[in-house]
Amino acid sequence: MTNTTTIQFNALLLDIEGTITSISFVKDELFPYAFENVGKYLEEHYDKPATQIIIEDLRRLAEQQLETDADVVKIRERKQECIEDVTKNVRHWIKRDKKLTPMKALQGLIWEEAYQRGYVKGHVYPDVLPILKIIESRQIPIYIYSSGSVHAQKLLFANSVEGDMTKILYGYFDTNIGLKGETSSYTKISEQIGVPEKDILFLTDVEAEAAAASKAGLQTRLVIRPGNATLTQEAKNAYGTIHTLEEIL
C-alpha cells in the first residue's frame, strides 16, 4: 500500500542506495571505480598512515574470512605482494557484495580521490533535497544509515549533483553501529540520537531492513524507485510504500 496519511515523526533516518540515491549509481559507477582502481590507489598511497591502518585491518579480516571462504588469500608483508593480495581480496568482496567494514573504509578513500578529482558526482533523486530542506526547517533532525562507511557517505553528500548537502544532515551511521538487518542496530541508533524508537521514521528499499527497524519499534516505509528489487505484497502491506519523499510530509 502507498502511504495516504500524514506521518508524525521527530527524527528521519535514511538509507542511501535505492532510497535517495539510485542503485545504478552505486552499482554501475562507484563499485566499478573502486574495483578498477584499488591496486592503483594502493600503489600511490601505500605509505600513508591511513592506508597502513586499513591494510592491517584487512589483514586481520582476511585471516577471519579464510575460515569460511577459500577464495580469500592471506595478505603477505612485502609491499608488492601485499598490494597484490589486498587487491585480490577487495575485488573478490566487491563481486560478492560483502558488507565488510575495512573494505568499505578503503573504498571510501578511493572514492574520496575520485570526488576530489571530479571523476564522479554523487547521485541524488530530484525530490530529495527540497523535501529534506522542508523537514530541516521544521527542526526535525535527519540522519543517514548505510552499509557504506560514514566517510563514503559524507563524500557522496558533500559532492552531490545537488551541491553540498552535508549542512542539513545531523549525523551518519554505518556498520560500526551494527548490520542493517539486525534489530539491535536501530535500538542503538535511537539511544545515540536521543529520540524514542516510535518517533523515528526509517526509509529503505530493503524488506529485511524495514523488518528489523519495525521490530525495534521504528516507523518504516519501503521506497520504490526505478531499478529497485521487487517488493513482496506482504512487505508492502506491513510497512507501506512511497515513491518519492514528498509522500512523508
Swiss-Prot record:
GO CC list: cytoplasm; nucleus
UniProt keyword Nucleus present: yes
Cofactor: how and how many bound: Binds 1 Mg(2+) ion per subunit.
Subcellular location: Cytoplasm; Nucleus
Key words, A-Z: Amino-acid biosynthesis, Cytoplasm, Hydrolase, Magnesium, Metal-binding, Methionine biosynthesis, Nucleus
InterPro entries in alphabetical order: Enolase-ppase_E1, ENOPH1_eukaryotes, HAD-like_sf, HAD-SF_hydro_IA, HAD_sf
Assembly mode: Monomer.
Stored HAMAP family: Salvage_MtnC, Salvage_MtnC_euk
Function: Bifunctional enzyme that catalyzes the enolization of 2,3-diketo-5-methylthiopentyl-1-phosphate (DK-MTP-1-P) into the intermediate 2-hydroxy-3-keto-5-methylthiopentenyl-1-phosphate (HK-MTPenyl-1-P), which is then dephosphorylated to form the acireductone 1,2-dihydroxy-3-keto-5-methylthiopentene (DHK-MTPene).
Name this polypeptide is given: Enolase-phosphatase E1
Organism: Caenorhabditis briggsae
